[in-house]
Amino acid sequence: MIDGLFVIDAVAHAYNHLPENWADPVLGDAMVELAYALAADPPDPKYALGRDVYLSNWQVPDVANLLFRESDTDVAVMHPLAISSFIDGYSSVAKAAEAISKYPSRFIGAYACVDPLKGDEAIRSLEEQVDLLKPMGLKLYPTSWDGTKPVSWRMDDPKLIYPLYERAAKLGLKHVAVHKAVPIGPFAVGDAYNPSDLENAATDFPHLSFEIVHGGLAFLEETAWLLARFGNIYINMEIQNIIVERRPRTFAQILLGLCKVGGTGMLDRLFWGSGGTLHHPQPGLEAFAKFEFPEDLLDNSGLFMPMRQISRENKANMLSGTFARLHGIDIEACKRAIAGDEFSRPAGAPLPKPYSTISMAGQVEEWQRERA
């Protein structure tokens, strides 16, 4: 908990950045370099990581230590990444299964993730993951690799994507997370990262909820109109944890932009996500806990109504309440389940030094010593 508020991290990854995992060297290299660039040079150097450690094959116990021992994150949800430019996925289904099996009270669930380009094989993979993971939802990306080149698509494609929504619903899944806004490589993607294609999806599948992962980092106005118009569209704030730490005024502009059409109530359709090992989870939480909208931005925000200051209730919803309601999670039961476990700290005890509890702690310490 941070500032007395329970924290659910809605998306954690155990990345395998290693070249041995690249099916396509161009796209693989582009994606890992994008990830490292996002996390490089944090304001507080104690959260910096050298390339050798960052661009490694992260193991589940290290992800758990980062989230639950070294940060104020209480529980998390693991997302595998079925992007075919990586041989075993960028974050494998096996790691998601390991996380929820080894730490069930902390990794309270996982999403299934499939590559739509695989057609019937994607359907079979979804069915297998439903058996293995009992997933909370389905995660989709708008780009993958067809064996020769990157291919992108829209999330309202009736032949490629709608069969996945239909099968997910038949399998009991009610939630679909869609990566948007942040292209994953230096190649043409058309409008695949524009969330406007969710207009048709949200209309045609009103019984499903859609979370726009990275919503607001691009196509801000389009996203704001979607939030205002569709009650089954939400925002997963992954990467915004980095922005609130480093560029709080930009973070404020993003949140206010998302609320521009629908008003401050749209804040309660956003929920926290860090990406797990994308960047250390603690500094973003600390920055968000003390965050307020600059008054000059408030004075110039809102299309149809004035915006009010972010409240403690808004923060509680963004950190856990909204996601918990969406998925039927009992927060009090979660608190009881983690009380006194291996990650618990005595009241008032400080957090461990960043990266000191992971298996690569010695490498981190040596790199930071050389860098100083």
Feature-to-residue mapping (PLM):
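Mid-to-C-terminal alpha-helical segments outside catalytic/metal-binding sites
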Residues: 1-10, 17-66, 124, 264-269, ...
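Conserved, mostly hydrophobic/aromatic
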Residues: 11, 96, 100, 129, ...
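Histidine-centered divalent metal-coordination motifs
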Residues: 11-17, 179, 214
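Short aromatic-enriched loop/helix-cap "lid" or pocket-rim segments at secondary-structure transitions
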Residues: 18-24, 90, 123-125, 150-153, ...
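Catalytic domains of carbohydrate-active enzymes, especially glycoside hydrolases
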Residues: 53-80, 133
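Alpha-helical scaffolding within the catalytic cores
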Residues: 58-65, 94-97, 122-126, 195-198, ...
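Active-site gating/metal-coordination segments in enzymes
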Residues: 75-184, 189-191
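Catalytic pocket-lining loop regions of alpha/beta-barrel enzymes
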Residues: 136, 144, 150-272, 276-279, ...
